[in-house]
Amino acid sequence: MAKTFVISDTHFNHAGILSFKDYIGKPVRDFDSVEQMNEAMMDNWVSVVGPKDTVIHCGDVLFGMDKADWMARNFDKLPGKKRLVVGNHDNLKILAPFFRDMQLWIDMSDKGLLFTHTPQHESTLAESHRFGSKPLLNVHGHIHTNPSPEGPFKCVCVEQINFTPVDIEELI
């Protein structure tokens, strides 16, 4: 049976992110090079996602120079049907050929999930789900190693999910 996975803020090809530190001074991505980081995330993706699965990417797919070339050489090697929730660093013109669809959010209220790039205000979550039977869990990215706000939030930035897509059934 096909599964649905989620991941966010891969920042493929973003060499600068390797120098970022968290609030206690620890590197947010402990890799020796951008190539090692890219390879680790791609290997992790391939290890859990099958060709019939779907992957919701909650934004900030890649960064840096030669984005279109990097996507053409690498992204199609990753299995699964890819859906994008647009992030603040995403170039839609470059990314469009590689995603089945691109949205500002994906509402799976039948499963109690709302996928966004940034955490939404709790009142937005309550309002968007007032006719349903399940409360919405806001599955989001953007904040990297920072904690999600209190309440119905789950960050799926790669730094918080061991650089590996997560099966949404684990979130429900």
Question: What do the predicted segments below correspond to?
Answer:
Residues 2-8, 12-108:
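Core catalytic region of metal-dependent phosphoesterases/phosphodiesterases
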Residues 97-172:
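Conserved beta-sheet core of the metallophosphoesterase superfamily
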